[in-house]
Amino acid sequence: MSKKYDAGVKEYRDTYWTPDYVPLDTDLLACFKCTGQEGVPREEVAAAVAAESSTGTWSTVWSELLTDLEFYKGRCYRIEDVPGDKESFYAFIAYPLDLFEEGSITNVLTSLVGNVFGFKALRHLRLEDIRFPMAFIKTCGGPPNGIVVERDRLNKYGRPLLGCTIKPKLGLSGKNYGRVVYECLRGGLDLTKDDENINSQPFQRWRERFEFVAEAVKLAQQETGEVKGHYLNCTATTPEEMYERAEFAKELDMPIIMHDYITGGFTANTGLANWCRKNGMLLHIHRAMHAVIDRHPKHGIHFRVLAKCLRLSGGDQLHTGTVVGKLEGDRQTTLGYIDNLRESFVPEDRSRGNFFDQDWGSMPGVFAVASGGIHVWHMPALLAIFGDDSCLQFGGGTHGHPWGSAAGAAANRVALEACVKARNAGREIEKESRDILMEAAKHSPELAIALETWKEIKFEFDTVDKLDVQ
């Protein structure tokens, strides 16, 4: 007997609230923080999110009979209170894997954070976490190279990579830009980088910058005997222009390029990561625009989701904040998404904001990049927080040195190596930070001046987006 079509409107929870459902290993799981309109039951709000982010619409439609809705629909299977927040709750939703195109982060986000975020029944909605099933992970390219290969390419072992952003970020001619790159690299840095908003402006066209930077990198390598590099930002107006810039960086024998993955988009990022994998290039990723999306504690997408998506889309390095610098991010939350960038398995741990177990299988890891308002006094804490598989980037903390960028670079290199040596000797580098740095400064006038210059500089502001734990 054929199914009967009943026209009309029915409550979402009749179809999409399934508290008895046990998620499958192949399901994509999502945790949303929901704040519904007054008077709307939690189950209805949660079911509406499940429906509108999967197969549902506001009215029953006859064409449902042409498919197996029970197979394809998203299911809200659990609701939890948010500690310390009486208005909001967590909704856990399971999505069948067949709802998503293989390897497409663009498609996943279009479904999960598409129209549903404008739904009138919701006052606020935030995607807190995603558990990507292994069946989906295996369809993604992931980092073009990964941590191990990047260390081999750069010949850097046993410590974090050391870098800086060229300042001023805008306004320098190509030749002067290259001069600053050279000063930093000869002073002791491993890498320098374009800032996120340097592309190809009237004061400095991209080709000119690439050529002068390549000259600076090669000269610094010859003088120091070390492998050096510069993140050449290939973000562009069109994908075609992006690839043209990447190809030119390769022609110049540069080891690493850069992309602004949120403003550039996941489709462009995945394409560039695939190109890097085929062409033996490292890929540095900047997260410009992330705070517009992730900083509000009740609405948007948490950065841990954006970090997971980047690992799948592809990148060898990703900015993650600093904890101690000028940018938002507490220690435990930051460690939570650093784990998801680098580890092969990350267990559920609410104290770090991880709502699910996440198995990454054999997918390579991503270097965590600490950048933003950091200087030599922060070095012990940065090493303790980020560990060796990171890149520590001091922009103002290099160029702001009274003796210039080369001296600033030397100060940072001495501070880093002193902290690594102390850690390897078993010292508690955060507790003994002052003693470690002052001892090193006895043999480095550059470090001594840097310590004096920035001794009063702190960024002690309370975190806006705090973990929901008691």
From Swiss-Prot:
InterPro entries, per the entry: RuBisCO, RuBisCO_lsu_C, RuBisCO_lsu_C_sf, RuBisCO_lsu_fd_N, RuBisCO_lsu_N_sf, RuBisCO_lsuI
Cofactor: Mg(2+)
The keyword Metal-binding appears for this protein: yes
Catalyzed reactions: 2 (2R)-3-phosphoglycerate + 2 H(+) = D-ribulose 1,5-bisphosphate + CO2 + H2O; D-ribulose 1,5-bisphosphate + O2 = 2-phosphoglycolate + (2R)-3-phosphoglycerate + 2 H(+)
GO molecular function, one term: ribulose-bisphosphate carboxylase activity
Residues at which Mg(2+) binds: K193, D195, E196
EC number in record: 4.1.1.39
Matches recorded under Pfam families: RuBisCO_large, RuBisCO_large_N
Active-site residues, record numbering mapped to chain: K167, H286
Modified residues (N6-carboxylysine): K193
GO terms of biological process kind: photorespiration; reductive pentose-phosphate cycle
One annotated Gene Ontology cellular component of this protein: carboxysome
Sorted UniProt keywords: Bacterial microcompartment, Calvin cycle, Carbon dioxide fixation, Carboxysome, Lyase, Magnesium, Metal-binding, Monooxygenase, Oxidoreductase, Photorespiration, Photosynthesis
Cofactor binding summary note: Binds 1 Mg(2+) ion per subunit.
Site (Transition state stabilizer): K326
List of residues binding substrate: N115, T165, K169, R287, H319, S371
Miscellaneous note of the record: The basic functional RuBisCO is composed of a large chain homodimer in a 'head-to-tail' conformation. In form I RuBisCO this homodimer is arranged in a barrel-like tetramer with the small subunits forming a tetrameric 'cap' on each end of the 'barrel'.
Family, as annotated: Belongs to the RuBisCO large chain family. Type I subfamily.
Main function: RuBisCO catalyzes two reactions: the carboxylation of D-ribulose 1,5-bisphosphate, the primary event in carbon dioxide fixation, as well as the oxidative fragmentation of the pentose substrate in the photorespiration process. Both reactions occur simultaneously and in competition at the same active site.
HAMAP family with a match to the protein in the record: RuBisCO_L_type1
Subunit structure: Heterohexadecamer of 8 large chains and 8 small chains. Forms a CsoS2-CsoS1-RuBisCO complex.
Protein name listed in UniProt: Ribulose bisphosphate carboxylase large chain
